[in-house]
């Protein structure tokens, strides 16, 4: 149970492993996930480390696996493993490399063959369409001249005047071009050839598949008639520039028909070959999909092990690997057992050796968590990772955080919706975890599902205390107020009811108030009262002050446990005690006055109740001559004066005494060190040849050096300034933090008012509509009301209350005892590496 409230006790050990057993031992520690390795090669470049070649081989295997994953994407479903395979031995890497490289080579060859076949299929398909279109065009060859003259082709307007032997020399080029380039192609062709060409094109009916990008492309078939070799060269250059594919097209119709038949035969053969190639490729992908996840885990584990081995020192002479590890003391037995398993797996005869190392380096902070407490621990760590072995605020945050959130968010209707959402995530967490989405917003909500669960439960509780459910009160037990006695004694009558705009119930009249308060929460009659806000504001404001001061005092008390654990007696006397005196004499007394007034002033004497605010102000001014504000109790002046004097005394108590005591202690240690040095010098002069004297000389010198080091670290000015900052921060912080807790009242008021406005402006208007239109309209209005409730009151207001609760815990609560300057324990864990949650 100790580890729940304080971080785990850690141990730094030096680990000696035989070279042959190092890999297996590190792998077993990775499976265990309880050891953090220190990098002993910080000054060595990553490319100069011992196992850099093995890491590169693993990265090469990862590249092959990424290639296989890309090939399988959207085609083959990878078979996930329920249980992670064990880390492969180093000799198994060669087998894995052979299998993956062979599979990669076969798949690349299949892809290249398939791409080449599809390219041939594309070209033959284009040629097929081209031959069909040119055949259709040449069938109208007899009317070609008429077509020329009907087109706006001024360069060939004199074609009828040209002799027959000249017209017979017209040449043509046929090809295929992308449809989006057709307009530019036609325009450039016209300008460069100055209109001395005849262009005719036709759109291909079906889209074609690009063999490289595998995207569908739309193409056009064109045929260009020209006269002369120069025009032919220009047209070919333009076609090359626009990446148009030019195909040979024979002039005789018989040859074109024969060529078309040949193309159709080749296409049929090509389709058969492509089908066989695709079947072979699918078989390769199926083989890869069956083992891909297992291969990936094995490669990642091997790579992680070699990364850890690169952080170790290797003693070539002794043939051993030296590592330094942090681990929890409570898990030492499990770690030794894992090392023994690694030794047995490797077949080594030398057992691993663990020796404890003393270090001045602060150990890492390790707080054990589960899926319930992890969210609360993350809230604490987001502010700062706790110092080693200091009090962990997370166990207290489990209760205080959702409670303070609920104080601001208190509405049992909204809390129920939040509770149902959290329960849905919790009940379906296995299915939702298996989806492994990258949506950060969803992951944030899902990882905080237990936090949302508690926030919903506490919101229902505070909502029942406020008697607030979607801005309406619940009359469960019946009101403790009655109107009839006001009429019986004649206070109210018909004339009063006609003349008065508001009527006020007088609890001093017998029977108006039954004397027994509402069994749980606030009486529902306050929801009808016009002075509801006045009553609730007073109640919530005082409640916020009480909760805030109680939490701050609790934080100061927790600092006592830190001082006791670290044996800081000086801090207990000179820091904790004056801090408690200051906060209790001032703000603890304020809580006492609030509760005292609640208990001692009932409805019969409430008219003469004094003002707590005026009493609290006069307390600091030592002003007790105000006769208009009666004292709360006897001897109030003496008690309050004593409290103020004690609070004033506690300030120099915190500020001055500790720095001077530390300076006196430092001077005393320096004086003792100088005396030891003098005695050692006299002994050396008496017998300089004695071995014991030389040993004493070394001991005294070491002691003096250590004290000198300590003396250099001590600086009275720094200590005094630090203590002054702490004192000022604490004294002013108590005042500002108490005021900061009033956000509990402000946020609760804002939430209640927004909820009431939403009900009045939206839902109430739908409920007041009568007739058939009202029946239909209420469904529409309820949908609008539900959407606005979720969007504004649950998400926006919920996020606002969440952030304010964070602020109250991080600043107002944790600064009383929590240092938070540690660093997180980051164990070498295969589970974290495979999940992608490993710390860098």
UniProtKB/Swiss-Prot annotation:
Instruction: Write down the InterPro entries for this protein, in alphabetical order.
Output: V-ATPase_116kDa_su, V-type_ATPase_116kDa_su_euka
Q: Which GO terms describe its molecular function?
A: ATPase binding; proton-transporting ATPase activity, rotational mechanism
- UniProt-reported outcome of changing residue 524 to L: In DRTA3; uncertain significance
Summed up, the tissue specificity of this protein is:
Expressed in adult and fetal kidney. Found in the inner ear.
Sorted alphabetically, which Pfam families does this protein's record hold?
A: V_ATPase_I
Listed A to Z, the keywords are:
Cell membrane, Disease variant, Hydrogen ion transport, Ion transport, Membrane, Transmembrane, Transmembrane helix, Transport
Q: What is the first-listed, main subcellular location in coarse terms?
A: membrane
Q: Which residues lie on this side of the membrane: Cytoplasmic?
A: 1-390, 429-443, 559-576, 663-727, 813-840
Q: Where is this region: Disordered?
A: 675-704
Which biological process annotations from GO are given for this protein?
Answer: intracellular pH reduction; ossification; proton transmembrane transport; regulation of pH; renal tubular secretion; sensory perception of sound; synaptic vesicle lumen acidification; vacuolar acidification
Q: Which GO terms describe its cellular component?
A: apical part of cell; apical plasma membrane; basolateral plasma membrane; brush border membrane; endosome; endosome membrane; extracellular exosome; lysosomal membrane
Q: Which residues lie on this side of the membrane: Vacuolar?
A: 410-411, 474-538, 598-642, 753-773
Name residues in a coiled coil.
none
Membrane topology designation: Multi-pass membrane protein
| Stated role | Subunit of the V0 complex of vacuolar(H+)-ATPase (V-ATPase), a multisubunit enzyme composed of a peripheral complex (V1) that hydrolyzes ATP and a membrane integral complex (V0) that translocates protons. V-ATPase is responsible for acidifying and maintaining the pH of intracellular compartments and in some cell types, is targeted to the plasma membrane, where it is responsible for acidifying the extracellular environment. Involved in normal vectorial acid transport into the urine by the kidney.
| Similarity annotation | Belongs to the V-ATPase 116 kDa subunit family.
Cite the record's note on assembly: V-ATPase is a heteromultimeric enzyme made up of two complexes: the ATP-hydrolytic V1 complex and the proton translocation V0 complex. The V1 complex consists of three catalytic AB heterodimers that form a heterohexamer, three peripheral stalks each consisting of EG heterodimers, one central rotor including subunits D and F, and the regulatory subunits C and H. The proton translocation complex V0 consists of the proton transport subunit a, a ring of proteolipid subunits c9c'', rotary subunit d, subunits e and f, and the accessory subunits ATP6AP1/Ac45 and ATP6AP2/PRR.
Which clinical disorder is mentioned? Renal tubular acidosis, distal, 3, with or without sensorineural hearing loss: An autosomal recessive disease characterized by reduced ability to acidify urine, variable hyperchloremic hypokalemic metabolic acidosis, nephrocalcinosis, and nephrolithiasis. It is due to functional failure of alpha-intercalated cells of the cortical collecting duct of the distal nephron, where vectorial proton transport is required for urinary acidification.
Please identify the protein, giving its name as recorded.
V-type proton ATPase 116 kDa subunit a 4
Gene name, please? ATP6V0A4
């Amino acid at each position: 149970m100790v580890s729940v409230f304080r971080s785990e006790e850690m141990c730094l050990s030096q680990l000696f492993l035989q070279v042959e057993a190092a890999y297996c031992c590190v792998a077993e520690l990775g499976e265990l996930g309880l050891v953090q390795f220190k990098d002993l090669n910080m000054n060595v470049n990553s490319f100069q480390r011992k196992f850099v070649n093995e890491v590169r081989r693993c990265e090469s295997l990862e590249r092959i696996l990424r290639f296989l994953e890309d090939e399988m994407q959207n085609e083959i479903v990878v078979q996930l493993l329920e249980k992670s395979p064990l880390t492969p031995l180093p000799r198994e890497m060669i087998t894995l490399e052979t299998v993956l490289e062979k599979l990669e080579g076969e798949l690349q060859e299949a892809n290249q063959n398939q791409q080449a076949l599809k390219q041939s299929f594309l070209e033959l398909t284009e040629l097929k369409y081209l031959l069909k279109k040119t055949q259709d065009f040449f069938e109208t060859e007899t009317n070609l001249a008429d077509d020329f003259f009907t087109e706006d082709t001024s360069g060939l307007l004199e074609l009828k005047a040209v002799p027959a032997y000249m017209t017979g020399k017209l040449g043509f080029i046929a090809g295929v071009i992308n449809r989006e380039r057709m307009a530019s192609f036609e325009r450039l062709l016209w300008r460069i050839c100055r209109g001395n060409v005849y262009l005719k094109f036709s759109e291909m009916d079906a889209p074609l598949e690009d063999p490289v990008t595998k995207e569908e492309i739309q193409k056009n078939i064109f045929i260009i008639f020209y006269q002369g070799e120069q025009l032919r060269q220009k047209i070919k250059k333009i076609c090359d520039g626009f990446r148009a594919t030019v195909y040979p097209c024979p002039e005789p119709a018989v040859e074109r028909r024969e060529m078309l038949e040949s193309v159709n035969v080749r296409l049929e053969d090509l389709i058969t070959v492509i089908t066989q190639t695709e079947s072979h490729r699918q078989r390769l992908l199926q083989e890869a999909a069956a083992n891909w996840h297992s291969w990936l885990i094995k490669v990642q584990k091997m790579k992680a092990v070699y990364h850890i081995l690169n952080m170790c020192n290797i003693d070539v002479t002794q043939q051993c690997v030296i590592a330094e590890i942090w681990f929890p003391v409570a898990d030492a037995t499990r770690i030794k057992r894992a090392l023994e398993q690694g030794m047995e797996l490797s077949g080594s005869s030398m057992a691993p050796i663990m020796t404890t190392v003393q270090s001045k380096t602060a150990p890492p902070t390790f707080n054990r968590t589960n899926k319930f407490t992890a969210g609360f621990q993350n809230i604490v760590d987001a502010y700062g990772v706790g110092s080693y072995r200091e009090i962990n605020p997370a166990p207290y945050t489990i209760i205080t955080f959702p409670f303070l959130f609920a104080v601001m968010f208190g509405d049992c209707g909204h809390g129920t919706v939040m509770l149902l959402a959290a329960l849905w995530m919790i009940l379906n967490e296995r299915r939702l975890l298996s989806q492994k989405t990258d949506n950060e917003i969803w992951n944030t909500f899902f990882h905080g599902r237990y936090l949302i669960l508690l926030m919903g439960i506490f919101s229902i509780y505070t909502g029942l205390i406020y008697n607030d459910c979607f801005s309406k009160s619940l009359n469960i037990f019946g009101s403790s107020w009655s109107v009839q006695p006001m009429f019986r004694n004649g206070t109210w009558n018909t004339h009063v009811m006609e003349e008065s705009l508001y009527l006020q119930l007088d609890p001093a009249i017998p029977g108006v108030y039954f004397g027994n308060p509402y069994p749980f929460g606030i009486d529902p009659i306050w929801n009808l009262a016009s002075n509801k806000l006045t009553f609730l504001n007073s109640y919530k404001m005082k409640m916020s002050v009480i909760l805030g001061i109680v939490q701050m005092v609790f934080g100061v008390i927790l600092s006592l446990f830190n001082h006791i654990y670290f044996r800081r007696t000086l801090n207990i006397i000179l820091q904790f005690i004056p801090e408690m005196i200051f906060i209790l004499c001032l703000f603890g007394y304020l809580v006492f006055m609030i509760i005292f007034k609640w208990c001692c002033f009932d409805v019969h004497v409430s008219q003469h109740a004094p003002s707590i605010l005026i009493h609290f102000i006069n307390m600091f001014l030592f002003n007790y001559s105000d006769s208009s504000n009666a004292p709360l109790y006897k001897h109030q002046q003496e008690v309050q004066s004593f409290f103020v004097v004690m609070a004033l005394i506690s300030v120099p108590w915190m500020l001055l005494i500790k720095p001077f005591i530390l300076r006196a202690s430092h001077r005393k240690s320096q004086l003792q060190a100088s005396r030891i040095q003098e005695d050692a010098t006299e002994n050396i002069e008496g017998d300089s040849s004695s071995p014991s004297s030389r040993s004493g000389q070394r001991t005294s010198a070491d002691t003096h050096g250590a004290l000198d080091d300590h003396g250099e670290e001590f600086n009275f000015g720094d200590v005094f300034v630090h203590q002054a900052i702490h004192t000022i921060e604490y004294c002013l912080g108590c005042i500002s933090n108490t005021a900061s807790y009033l956000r509990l009242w402000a946020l609760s008021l804002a939430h209640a008012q927004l909820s009431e406005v939403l009900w009045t402006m939206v839902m109430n208007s739908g409920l007041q509509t009568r007739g058939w239109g009202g029946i239909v309209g209420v469904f529409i209005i309820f949908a609008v009301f539900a959407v606005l409730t979720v969007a504004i009151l649950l998400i926006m207001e919920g996020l606002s209350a969440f952030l304010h609760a964070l602020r109250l815990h991080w600043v107002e609560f944790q600064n009383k005892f929590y240092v938070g300057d540690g660093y997180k324990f980051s164990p070498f864990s295969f589970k974290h590496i495979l999940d992608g949650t490993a710390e860098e």
